[in-house]
């Protein structure tokens, strides 16, 4: 039940014991003998040892799958690349401090490393960045030959559909990798201050884990004690070396395979207006998925003075078939210029 379910307390909780399992206080978890799901299982069911659990599952309905498909197809049509990788560079603990972005828990990838990785991948593959934060990838990004997609999607089930339709996932210690596992997708996961045994799927055939913190981290006893010394010790655990960046890129390329150009024809979805209307409003897949086209402000764009990301999910222009049709399209573009214009700073 959702916590706002009517009479949830009166009908289902009041006559029962109310338990609050704490997986981070399970001995097997903080000694790297089980993962988070197994720790919950032990705490809830009073087990002495972890047991093998079935793989997580996410069941998407048809509207979610359609929304994800349209978003990915639109990205392909704009970037002209047929293979798509979703990149989730940051975890929930990422913070924007003035012109900088940092993760005090060292679970997110370093910004410099992320930019290097994406700039290499975007040359051959379509890249969708799964992040609420906008950050520049390079100088003069507006003029870059290879653009990336930054859809601001608030519904995590739509993100699940995007990951499902995409060809590969690249992420850190965050929810994206678990979505990829639940959907049987391939994934490259970069970990730093946390242990793969606790938070990921080491040894799984579809997962490549790049352990940047191996040999230079200690377990952070979250929800048990506050240990500033450990946090300081782990401070550099997610700083990626050139060799580790190469490992990440090579893993993605191996999983994605040989790049190829997009040869399909993307038809933008249209949402029907009121029944009395004879015309339908033009909306792209991103808007139909619940996203909002908002210009980034100073609070959402780190590093003031850097170029604003120029990629918006716009509909590809159809080639005219004759002169009269061409003139008609020109008139249409004049009247609808704002809807089709790529953002410029």
Q: What is each model feature region?
A:
Residues 1-36, 158-161, 176-178, 341:
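Active-site and donor-binding regions of nucleotide-sugar-utilizing enzymes
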Residues 1-4, 14-17, 22-26, 140-153, ...:
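Active-site regions of enzymes building and remodeling cell-envelope glycoconjugates
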Residues 25-74, 203-276:
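Leloir-type glycosyltransferase catalytic cores
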Residues 55-131, 135, 244, 267-270, ...:
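Core catalytic architecture of nucleotide-activated donor-dependent transferases building glycoconjugates
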Residues 76, 122, 249, 253, ...:
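Residue-level detector of alpha-helical secondary structure
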Residues 100-197:
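Donor-binding and catalytic core of enzymes assembling or modifying cell-surface/extracellular glycoconjugates
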Residues 271-315, 319, 323:
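Intrinsically disordered, low-complexity repeat regions enriched in Pro/Gln/Gly/Tyr
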Residues 319, 323-345:
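Basic, mixed-charge low-complexity alpha-helical segments
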């Amino acid at each position: 039940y959702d916590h706002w379910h009517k009479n949830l307390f009166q009908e289902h909780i009041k006559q029962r014991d109310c338990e609050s399992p704490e997986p981070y206080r399970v001995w097997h978890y903080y000694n790297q003998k089980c993962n988070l799901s197994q720790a919950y299982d032990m705490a809830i069911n009073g087990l002495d040892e972890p047991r093998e659990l079935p793989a997580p599952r996410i069941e998407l309905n048809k509207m979610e799958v359609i929304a994800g498909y349209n978003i990915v197809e639109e990205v392909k049509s704009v970037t002209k690349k047929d293979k798509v990788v979703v990149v989730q560079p940051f975890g929930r603990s990422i913070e924007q401090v003035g012109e900088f972005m940092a993760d005090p828990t060292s679970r997110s990838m370093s910004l410099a490393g992320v930019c290097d990785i994406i700039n290499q991948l975007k040359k051959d593959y379509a890249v969708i960045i799964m992040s609420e934060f906008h950050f520049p990838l390079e100088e003069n990004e507006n003029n870059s030959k290879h653009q990336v997609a930054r859809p601001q999607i608030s519904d995590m089930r739509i993100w699940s559909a995007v990951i499902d339709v995409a060809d590969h996932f690249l992420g850190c210690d965050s929810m994206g990798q678990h979505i990829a596992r639940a959907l049987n997708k391939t994934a490259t996961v970069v970990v730093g201050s946390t242990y793969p045994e606790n938070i990921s799927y080491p040894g799984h055939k579809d997962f490549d884990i790049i352990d940047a913190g191996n040999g230079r981290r200690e377990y952070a006893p979250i929800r048990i004690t506050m240990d500033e010394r450990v946090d300081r010790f782990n401070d550099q655990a997610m700083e990626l070396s050139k060799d580790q960046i190469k490992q990440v890129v090579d893993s993605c390329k191996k999983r994605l395979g040989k790049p190829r150009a997009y040869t399909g024809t993307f038809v933008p979805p249209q949402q029907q207006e009121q029944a009395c209307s004879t015309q339908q409003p033009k909306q792209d897949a991103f808007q139909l998925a619940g996203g909002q086209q908002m210009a980034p402000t100073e609070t959402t764009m780190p590093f003031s003075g850097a170029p604003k990301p120029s990629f918006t999910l716009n509909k590809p222009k159809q080639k005219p078939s004759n002169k009269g049709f061409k003139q008609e399209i020109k008139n249409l573009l004049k009247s609808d210029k704002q809807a089709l214009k790529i953002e410029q700073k």
